[in-house]
Amino acid sequence: ECADKVRDEIKEKNGNDILLFYNDYSSFQTEKRDHICELIKEINSEEKLCDGMGMQSYIGGWADNDADRQNGCFSPYDLSNHKEAVEKYSALGVEVHITECAIRNFYNTESALKKHKEFYVKFVKQIEELNSGSTPKITNFSIWGLTDLPSTVTDSNYSYTMNGPYAGLYTSLNESFTYTKKDVYYAILEELNN
């Protein structure tokens, strides 16, 4: 209610067109998604106060150790959950923003980096498919954790578990922090240009 009043006052005073979003993490997980849908329905029951849904999308790999974390990465289940969540939020008549997309990866092996790249491309293709109709379902896509973090954080660090040390589109080959684009960067760019 307070955010709605502030929005209306700013619109009236400055003529700005402001949209209010509900933004939350793990919003593609089934149970949480369903609760959020009910919340948005309730908020918008009398008049449209919530204009959009912000999906913080930290995908894959929650566990206590790297081996289990890595086993939780690149799951087709996460892709289908994310797609279903976007469709459900969009069906409520609100814009959908992917506000923080981090496809987690905890290993710097050739195999893990290849799977990371392939999963990211599948995720971007899914966004393109969701937006292929006359009205886009996703109006913003922001990638979170652009760079790898292997030498700057330990496995007990929040950033390590949130993003994964090798989840970036760029990597530093040495301690000079000179960043190089990874194969995943070029694969995403190629998909977006097709």
Spans of features found by a protein language model:
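Glycoside hydrolase catalytic-domain groove-lining segments
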Residues: 1-23, 29-108, 124-134, 138
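Short, internal active-site loops enriched in acidic
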Residues: 25-30, 146-150
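Aromatic-rich peripheral "rim/lid" segments of glycoside hydrolase catalytic domains that contact
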Residues: 74-88, 92-97, 105-194
